[in-house]
Amino acid sequence: MYLFGSKRIRRTWYNVQKKRILDKFKIQEGIVGEYYTQYKSMKAVIIGSDEIFALHTGPTPVFWGYALPSDNVFAYAGCFGPTTITDIQAKRCESFVRGGLENLTALSVRDRNSHDIIEKLIGQDVEIVCDPVLLYGYKDELQTLPKVVQKPYLLVYAYDNNMNNIQEVQAIKKYAKARGLQIVSPGFYHDWCDKNINVDPVTLLSYFRDAQCVVTDTFHGSVMSILVNAEL
């Protein structure tokens, strides 16, 4: 009981620190401007990208164009993530999802699953486009990022509640031990990793770049590995 509690405390503290770092990064980079709720009318709104249509963490109305102060709402490179058409039906969200999609001025997606869901629900053959992370590329940032001062390491990039299966963990540990690598998790907390490190979104790229290899089960983990030519 105490061990379980201490793990939860460490994870909670890690996520508190993570929020502080991300909030500071947003301010420094000028990412967050005025909130849309301050406006009564806007010429257009662009939603996306990433898992804006995913329902596994609960539906967010504004991601579907609801309650936005504009008649022109576009979705770029949206994604349903792990959500399937069966999930939508099981959660009784079919009318919610269909209504949001039909009211969008135009939309595009980044993957086949999302394309197929939309085609089935509203009959649109939407375009599959590149995720902005791939389009941007971070070429300038990668040239100026300092090298990670760290023993040779295997990088794990998975959400907190993922990649904790005993068989998976044992296989990753065995692979790392055989190659003399530490196991490092930047951005998410896994108590079985040797190190859990909090970094801002750009510094995160340097951890991918300097890793001996990467183990990930996420879209952006794969994309960042491709951008820096990391071994997957």
Q: Which sequence ranges carry the predicted segments?
A:
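A conserved, positively charged/aromatic
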Residues: 98-102, 208
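Donor nucleotide-activated moiety binding/catalytic core segment of transferases
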Residues: 126-134, 138, 188-223
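An anion/phosphate-binding loop that grips the pyrophosphate of nucleotide cofactors and donors
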Residues: 42, 104, 211
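A short beta-strand/loop micro-motif in the catalytic core of glycosyltransferases
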Residues: 104-111, 215
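Structural loop-to-beta junction motif characteristic of Rossmann-like glycosyltransferase folds
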Residues: 229-232
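Catalytic donor nucleotide-activated moiety binding site of glycosyltransferases and closely related
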Residues: 75-82, 115-118, 158-201
